[in-house]
Amino acid sequence: MSPDELTDEVISRLAETPNERLREVMTSLVRHIHAFAKEVKLSEEEWMQGIQFLTRTGEITDEVRQEFILLSDTLGLSSLVDMINHGSELQEVTESTILGPFYVPDSPSREFGESMVEFDDGGEPAILSGRVMDAEGSPVGGAELDVWQNAANGFYAVQQKEIQPSTNVRGRYFTNQLGEYEIKTVRPVPYPIPADGPVGMLLRDTGRHEWRAAHVHIKVS
């Protein structure tokens, strides 16, 4: 049996999968993962290293830390899935992006221009303002902006439940009739992703750093 015949045989075993979408996904997965192994001429040692890497990724994952999502993020798969599902052909609109691991629903509703800082750790004061417009450039009044970021110490409130108030530097704001919003906050800072696990090891082995640029998350609805 040749490698190509083996691939065809495995795919044929999936032909009776009752769920049509599952059959489509698994057939494509088998075809592409076999093609990958053949393209790079995967050795038995490399195959086992990959198995052990995925095993460690699962072992370090718990209800707080999702190492598999971190792996997906660093491989660009998370962003690709977001683009496929939420991308727009309109060049004028703001691009969608992944939600990230620190989003918490039901943040407090805050007034126009109100501060969302509830924990003073010496951060640099900042004002975030702008306008929400539709694809035609008209202002969108009453749009909800669900906003969250890290504190000046580099951590999100959800990461420091014993130190920061749970709603520190997060809140829901609403645009006025002109589509304007204004938020008082502190300047966000760069922070590293968790690098003490297998994904961190992979980043180091491939010459990449673990730092994310300073940013503010805004979910508009």
What residues fall within each predicted segment?
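Beta-strand-dominated extracellular/periplasmic modules and repeats
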Residues: 1-221
